[in-house]
Amino acid sequence: MKHKAFFIFMTALLIGSPLYAQKYKIALIHSYQEGYSGAGIVNKLFVKGLKDQQIDFQLRTFYLDCEKYESVEEEQRISEFADSIRSWEGDLIAVLDDQATYSIMACGNPYVR
């Protein structure tokens, strides 16, 4: 009986606990520059989606500014972003738009492999 009561208590405790109790460090990388109209909308929707799911998070946003740089420079910049995220001990990197996605896959940084 004692074990059964303990099992019921632990089950109730686990069911009642949010699965998202951990605070996640999330990096969001945009292809375009800060101030780009679409970036603001995406940032708001991204944050709203996380909050709607009751996910506790800390967000850092990076802007690749792909129209300003050539591919080699973009890959270097995004590799530096990855190093910064690693130092910050980020849990997740979300990449938005084609150019940032290509650059992060091509940069060769071991943190994003």
Where are these regions (language model features)?
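Short hydrophobic alpha-helices and adjacent helix-cap/hinge residues
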Residues: 2-4, 19-113
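Bacterial N-terminal signal peptides
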Residues: 8-16
